[in-house]
Amino acid sequence: MADLSFLNLEEVEEEAKKVMPKMAFDYYSTGSDTCYTVGENRSCFSRYLLLPRMLRNVSRVDTSHELFGIRSSMPVWVAPMAMHGLAHPGREVATCRAAAAAGVPFTFSTVATSSLQEIQETGHDNRIFQLYVIRNREVVRRWVTEAESRGFKALMVTVDAQRLGNREADARNKFTLPPGLALRNLEYLSSASTVQARDSQDGSGLMKLFTSEVDDSLTWEFIPWLRGVTKLPIIVKGLLSPADAELAVQYGVDGIVVSNHGGRQLDYAPSGLHMLPAVVAAVRGCGSSIPVLVDGGVRRGTDVIKALALGASGVLLGRPVLYGLAVGGQAGVERVLQLLRSEIELSMALAGCSSVQQIGPQLLLPAPSAGPAPPMPAAQLCKL
């Protein structure tokens, strides 16, 4: 029986490292080049303090949340992540079932070891399909049409991976899919087998797959094309620049995820949390009220509260979910999500917030000794 006695999302990573093959753990845990951005995603949260308010009625704290008509037990979605089968035989199916049990939306990756049909059959109503855009638009159309027909609630288009980042751990390990696993959405592509082929000269099979299939000529004009083939909400994931956020609004997207791909693409890119206020300001400056979510480095309930206070509409949770899957399958993921929700609920109560809607910038102070934080508006300081 799996040991699910871990008490927080940092401990589950330690447990996952003990049980996962090195190639799989390195794939999940590392980033590109020096991995600076991986660390920055985590450390950025320490640059903010939380200023609690007292004598508020917190006898009942409501952590529930809704975006795009998608209900959640907390302001957290499971982020899109590739190849859950590397972590556990239950694959994405186990993760999706755990998300359903926790009342949390599940984002399903194009590069998955389960099929769209299998995810539909879990019975989880709140599913989002993450889309990598390959050169063959008919295949893209097929994915989108199938996702819509199988009841997925939105599309999340990843725009920061037109080329794969320099992931030296994968190259060193000559990353391949173990026997018995397949990229179920890519099986009809002739290049899909490259991710399973070891090559002592060329390193990671995943790098070769991306190079051969993903469209590195992609531009904003893809958004109108996609709008013409689906009625689903279109969320763009991977923006950091306020200028790109303005373009996203101009091209009519329905939501944005501020993200640096978990530090796995451009090293020394800023964290999503660092850029979040500027992106939100750019979107609102365009007169748009579309949701702006953020991911990267979330490990504590207080991290979620800080993100919401900085203007996030919601938060995506990535690596800890996979670590929970590795440690305990579906039960491990449920444990991760339960711990995070408990931390959010307690931290909200201690901060004097009885609902997610009460979380705002009035809760934040810059930490004096944790490195520079973005300046706070004078109007905000007057409310402290």
Curated annotation (Swiss-Prot):
EC number(s) from the headed UniProt entry: 1.1.3.-
EC class (word): oxidoreductase
**Which cofactors does this gene product need?**
FMN
Task: Name the keywords, alphabetized.
Answer: Flavoprotein, FMN, Oxidoreductase
Q: Which Pfam families match?
A: FMN_dh (PF01070)
List, for all copies, the residue spans of the domain called FMN hydroxy acid dehydrogenase. 1-369
Residues the entry annotates as binding pyruvate: Y27, Y132, R167, H261, R264
Q: How is the cofactor bound?
A: Binds 1 FMN per subunit.
Record-level Gene Ontology MF annotations? (S)-2-hydroxy-acid oxidase activity; FMN binding
Q: Name one GO biological process term.
A: response to other organism
* InterPro entries in the cross-refs: Aldolase_TIM, Alpha-hydoxy_acid_DH_FMN, FMN-dep_DH, FMN_HAD, FMN_hydac_DH_AS
> Which sites are catalytic?
H261 (proton acceptor)
Entry's transmembrane regions: none
The answer, when asked if Metal-binding is one of the entry's keywords, is no
Query: Gene3D superfamilies annotated for this entry?
Result: Aldolase class I
Positions of FMN binding: P80, M81, A82, S109, Q130, T158, K237, S259, D295, G296, G297, V298, R299, R319
* Catalytic activity as recorded in UniProt: (S)-lactate + O2 = pyruvate + H2O2
Provide the function of this protein.
Answer: Catalyzes the oxidation of (S)-lactate (L-lactate) to pyruvate, with a reduction of O2 to H2O2. Also shows a low oxidase activity with glycolate in vitro. The very low glycolate oxidase activity indicates that this enzyme is unlikely to be involved in photorespiratory glycolate metabolism, a pathway in which the oxidation of glycolate is taken over by glycolate dehydrogenase (GlcD).
How does this polypeptide assemble, per the annotation?
Answer: Homotetramer.
Task: Provide the family line.
Answer: Belongs to the FMN-dependent alpha-hydroxy acid dehydrogenase family.
Q: What is this protein called?
A: L-lactate oxidase
Tell me what organism the protein belongs to. Chlamydomonas reinhardtii
